UniProtKB/Swiss-Prot annotation:
Gene from which this protein is expressed: IGSF9B
List of residues that carry Phosphoserine: S775, S783, S794, S1207, S1215
SUPFAM superfamilies: Fibronectin type III, Immunoglobulin
GO (cellular component) term, any one: neuron projection
Topology feature Cytoplasmic, residues: 744-1349
InterPro entries attached to this UniProt entry: FN3_dom (IPR003961), FN3_sf (IPR036116), Ig-like_dom (IPR007110), Ig-like_dom_sf (IPR036179), Ig-like_fold (IPR013783), Ig_sub (IPR003599), Ig_sub2 (IPR003598), Ig_V-set (IPR013106)
Protein name as catalogued: Protein turtle homolog B
Ranges of biased composition (kind: Low complexity): 985-998, 1251-1271
Taxonomic source organism: Homo sapiens
Domain of life: Eukaryota
Keyword entries, A-Z: Cell adhesion, Cell membrane, Disulfide bond, Glycoprotein, Immunoglobulin domain, Membrane, Methylation, Neurogenesis, Phosphoprotein, Postsynaptic cell membrane, Repeat, Signal, Synapse, Transmembrane, Transmembrane helix
Domain Ig-like per the UniProt entry, residue ranges: 24-129, 139-226, 228-320, 324-415, 420-504
Compartments, record wording: Postsynaptic cell membrane; Postsynaptic density
Spans through the membrane: 723-743
Amino acid sequence: MIWYVATFIASVIGTRGLAAEGAHGLREEPEFVTARAGESVVLRCDVIHPVTGQPPPYVVEWFKFGVPIPIFIKFGYYPPHVDPEYAGRASLHDKASLRLEQVRSEDQGWYECKVLMLDQQYDTFHNGSWVHLTINAPPTFTETPPQYIEAKEGGSITMTCTAFGNPKPIVTWLKEGTLLGASGKYQVSDGSLTVTSVSREDRGAYTCRAYSIQGEAVHTTHLLVQGPPFIVSPPENITVNISQDALLTCRAEAYPGNLTYTWYWQDENVYFQNDLKLRVRILIDGTLIIFRVKPEDSGKYTCVPSNSLGRSPSASAYLTVQYPARVLNMPPVIYVPVGIHGYIRCPVDAEPPATVVKWNKDGRPLQVEKNLGWTLMEDGSIRIEEATEEALGTYTCVPYNTLGTMGQSAPARLVLKDPPYFTVLPGWEYRQEAGRELLIPCAAAGDPFPVITWRKVGKPSRSKHSALPSGSLQFRALSKEDHGEWECVATNVVTSITASTHLTVIGTSPHAPGSVRVQVSMTTANVSWEPGYDGGYEQTFSVWMKRAQFGPHDWLSLPVPPGPSWLLVDTLEPETAYQFSVLAQNKLGTSAFSEVVTVNTLAFPITTPEPLVLVTPPRCLIANRTQQGVLLSWLPPANHSFPIDRYIMEFRVAERWELLDDGIPGTEGEFFAKDLSQDTWYEFRVLAVMQDLISEPSNIAGVSSTDIFPQPDLTEDGLARPVLAGIVATICFLAAAILFSTLAACFVNKQRKRKLKRKKDPPLSITHCRKSLESPLSSGKVSPESIRTLRAPSESSDDQGQPAAKRMLSPTREKELSLYKKTKRAISSKKYSVAKAEAEAEATTPIELISRGPDGRFVMDPAEMEPSLKSRRIEGFPFAEETDMYPEFRQSDEENEDPLVPTSVAALKSQLTPLSSSQESYLPPPAYSPRFQPRGLEGPGGLEGRLQATGQARPPAPRPFHHGQYYGYLSSSSPGEVEPPPFYVPEVGSPLSSVMSSPPLPTEGPFGHPTIPEENGENASNSTLPLTQTPTGGRSPEPWGRPEFPFGGLETPAMMFPHQLPPCDVPESLQPKAGLPRGLPPTSLQVPAAYPGILSLEAPKGWAGKSPGRGPVPAPPAAKWQDRPMQPLVSQGQLRHTSQGMGIPVLPYPEPAEPGAHGGPSTFGLDTRWYEPQPRPRPSPRQARRAEPSLHQVVLQPSRLSPLTQSPLSSRTGSPELAARARPRPGLLQQAEMSEITLQPPAAVSFSRKSTPSTGSPSQSSRSGSPSYRPAMGFTTLATGYPSPPPGPAPAGPGDSLDVFGQTPSPRRTGEELLRPETPPPTLPTSGKLQRDRPAPATSPPERALSKL
C-alpha cells in the first residue's frame, strides 16, 4: 500500500514538472517553411498549458531576425500590435501561430515566437521557437539602364542590369534578338554590358534578360549613336521622257536628326544652274523633284545630307531623259573628197539611240543601196567609196528612234572637193639619244588649206615638244617619255589624212614591262609578262611580291634569270592573297613597276569524312497473282541522298534467297515475275541500289503460283481479245440487223406495191351526202362513174383476165383514190394506232355511200337498181381491218378467197353509184366488247322475251314514228301521224356496232323470199315487211352441231336479215303456207295495193319461247345433219368476204312456228306482206321509175341503238352480258347449217372501184379489200373469219365444192392468177336443200313456196 502511494506522489510531481517546463516554453528545433510570392503562409507556434487548473494569461510575441522590436504582439482579447510592413497581412492563427497573407520576397528570413506566461517566471533563453521562411519569387530587376541611352561615335558605353529573385536569376544581354558574348567589341560581366569603339552599326535595341526556374524578366534599352548622317535610301538611276517630272529620293538617318539635304548636278548645286533652278524643288525628306525635264537635264545628281556633326556622306544617281531623235547643227555644206572615200554625216541626237535614218536627195527619198559604192552606216551616215558628180545635190536626213522623230534636218548641199595631201612626209623611224634635239618634218596642202597636228599613239607625252607652222615636229630635248609611235594629221573641211613615224630614244633606262599575268596553285604562282623597250642596253627583270594585307614596305624582290620572261614563285601559303609586280633594269637604271596584280592561292583540300548516305529499304512490296504470273509492285525508299540507280529483286522457295533480277531501273516500281513453277509458294523481296550502297531488303511478300493460267491475248491498245471480239460482234450484229431491217422493209414495200397492183377495188364506204338541194340522180346528171352501174356483171374485163379498158376518171374519183392509197399504205405499214386510224377514217375514209335528200334524210333510191338477177351479191368492203376486236376481217381478206356471189346479191352490183366529193364518211368501226356471251339457239318466243327484257321490243300499240328504235324501211305516213324528223349523223366517237339496212329481197331469190317489186316492175304492198332478226345464239364449239347465234347477245340490232331455215327436213305441219315466209302467221301476207316508197325496217324478230335468261334452246337432232355431205362450215353471225370484198353475214333461219303461236300480227314476226307479182318483162330502172310515179326514195331513219348515236355497251342498262370469242383460224371451213344471204344496199349508195366497173360473172374473182379502210369498216360487230376447209379430196361434182351460197370456194391467189369455178352456182329451194343436179325451176322460189302452202 505504501508503495502505491509513493508511486502516485512521484507521478504527480513529475507531471507538474513537465507542465512547468511547457509553460516556460522550452526551445524546439527550428522549422523551415517555403512559400511562393503572393501566397499565404502560417508560421506555427505551440502553447502548452498546465494539466490542472485554469490556463494562465499569456502574451504572444513574434520577432523577425534583424528587426529589434517585435513585428507582432498579442495579449488576450486586446487588438494585436503589428509592424507597418506587415500591416494588413499578419494575423494570429490558432493560439500563437502567425499567419502572413500576400507574402513578399522581403518577408523571407528567420522568425521567432515567444509566449510569456504572466503568473510564472521563465527563462528568456529557453523560451521561444524559430521558423525560417523562404519565399520563391520570379526574377525582378532592381537596377536597369534607361530606355534610351546616347553614345558618341568612336567612344564606349556601359549598361548595367541587376535582378533579384529566389532562386537567384541569371542575367544575359541580347542585341536585336542575338545573344551577345564576350568579344573584342562587347564585354558582358555580372549583368553589365560594355560596348567599345561605338560606331553607327552599334546603334539599336539591347535587351537584358533575367531568368530562373520561377520565370524571367526582360528589359530593353535603345542605344543612340551621335554622329554624322547615314544615308539609308540612296537615290537610284531613273529614266523619264521629255516634258515629264523626275523624282529622285534620298533618305538619311542621324542622331541628332536635324538633317539638311543638298543636291548637286554635275558637281554643281542645282540652285546655281540658271536653266535648272527654276524647275527643281527639294522636299524635307530629301526628295528632289525636277519639273518638265529637258534633254539637257540628263546627267549625274548627288545627294548630300548633313547634321553639323562630322563629315557628311553623299550618294549619286543618273537621270536619263528620253526624247525623239533629232538633228543638231546640220552643216549647210557637206564636203566630200574626190578620188577617196568620203562621208555624208547626219548629226543625230537621240535617246534612246536612233534606229533608222532616212535620207532625201533633192526632195526625193534616197535609195542608198541602189547607188554603187554607197553604204549606210550604223550611225546613219552614208559612206561613199569614190564620189562622183552624180553625188551632187541637196541632202536632208530624218532620224528615228523608238519614240519617233522631231523632224528632218536642215538641207545640206554636197560639194566635191579635192582632199588634202602631204607635201612632206615624216620618215619611218627616228633614233636619237635622250637629251638631244630632234626635228621631224611634215607638210600638207589642199583646198581649203589643211591644218597639221601631231599626236602620240597610246599614252600622251608630257615632254617639251611642239608643232612648227610648217607642220614639222620639234623636240628640244628628248626624254624617255618621247619614245614611241607618232602621227602627223592634216585636216581641212573635206577630210583628214595621217602619216606615222616611230621615235626611238637611246640611252635611257628600260621601259616598264606590260601584260603581267599570274597563275596560282595552293603554294605556287607562275608570273609572266611582256618586256618593254630596254633603253638601248641589255635589261634584266625582277618580280616583286607581298601579301595583300601587309603594308607598302613588305614587298619582296625575286630576281629573274636572264632570258625568260616568266618566273615560278613557290613556298606560298594556301588560300592567301598575294600581290605581284615586275620591274626591268639595265645599266642605266630601272624601269617603272608594272601594274600590280592581286591573286589568291588555292586552299588545301579539306579532308572531310565521307558523307553519310542514308538509304532506306523500299516500301510496301505487294505481290498480285495474275493469269500469267506474279506482278510485284513497291514504293521507293522514303529517304535517300541520291537518286536510286536500280533495284534488285530476290526470291526464295526454301530457305535460301536467290537472285531474280538485279537490273530493274530505279524509275520503275513494278516487276512481273513469269515462268514460275506450279503449285509453289514464293516469297519476294526488293533492295535499292544507290551509287555503291545497297539498302536493307524490303518487306517480304508471299504468293502461291497455284491456278496461274495464261492471260488472254491483249491487243496493242490493251484490250483483251474476247472483249474486242465482243465489241466487233456487237457492231456486226447491229450492222446486220440494220441491213436485214432495210431488206425486210424493201421486201414489204415491194409486196405491198404488188398487192396494190393486184387489188384494184376502190375503198367502199357508207357516207352521207352533204346538204344539197339535188342529188346527181335527181338532177338528171349522170357522171362517168354511173355508167358502171348499168353494165352487166359479166362484162368486167378485170375478172375475165383480159386487158382492162381504162376510162377517164373524174377528178373526184382521182382524189378518192389518192386518199385511199395514202391511208392504205399508212395502215399496212403498221404505223396507225386504233385511235389514229379511227380519226383518219372519220376524216377521209367513208363507210358507205348514202345520198342525202333535200329534207336532210339519208336516201337510197331504188329507181336506179338494175333488174339483173344474174349475180346476187354486194361488192366486198376492202377496208375491213382485222383488229383485236374483229380479227376475222383481216383473215378473210388475207385468205384472198373469191367465192361465187349469190344471185340475190349480184343484182345489187349494177345499182351502185360512185362516191361523190361532197360526201362524208361515217365514224370508224366500234370497239369490240368483251362482254359478248354466245348463247344457245332460241325460238322466236325466247328472242321476243329477251328483247322485251332489254327494252328493245316495241309494243303492239302504234308509235308516232314508224322507224322506232332501229333502222328500217318506213311506210308512208298516215294522215294522222306526224312526219318523223330527218336523220343527221352526229360526230361522235367510235360506235359500238354497225347497222346495215337492207331493202326487201327479190322474189326470185334462192331463199324463198319475194324480190323487190321495182325489179319486177310491179306494185308493192302497202304493208311493212320486217327484214331484221337478232338471233340469240353464238358459235357452236362442235363443228357439226347446231351453231349458236352470235347476233343474239347484242343489244344493238347489228345485222338485220330475214330468218333462214337450216338445210334439213321440216315437218309438213310446220312448213309455212305457199307464198308466206316461214315462221310467220298468214296475217303477215297482206299485200297493199301499191308498193310504198318508204318501207319501215322493223325490229329484229325473236323466237317464240323463252328469253335468253330463262333457259337454252335445245339443239336440233343430230340425225338431221348426218345425211349432209361434208361442206365448209360457217358459223352464224360471221362476216365472210366474198370476191367483191363484202362481209357476208351468216344468219340462221328460225324454226317454223306452230300454228297459232302468234295470235295476231306480231311486231316481232317476219312480216311478209309482199304482194306476189306476176312474171312480166323487167323494165330498166329508169323505165320503172317513170312507169311508177308512186315509188319514192328509200329513207333510213336513225335507230335507238344507232352506232353513231349510242354509248358503249357497258354503259347501257339492261344489256346482256357479252364475252370475247376466240380468234377464228383462217382457212378452216365448217359445214353450214343454213344458207347465207347478202343484202342489196340502196341504189343511192355506190361502191367505187379502183379500175373500170366490174361486170364479171359471180364466179369470177375480185380483189380483197384495201387494208387502209379496214379500221373504218362498219360491219365488224359480230363478224368472224372463215375456218379453213378440212383436208379431203377435191370435189367430184359440181355440187361437192359448193358453199352455202351455191358458190365454189376460191383458193388463195398467187400473183395475179384468178381461178374460175367449173360449175354455175346452184339454187336453194324453199325446203332449204341444195339442188345440184336438177335444173333450176322456171318459177321463182317465192312462187313455189306459195303454191306449196
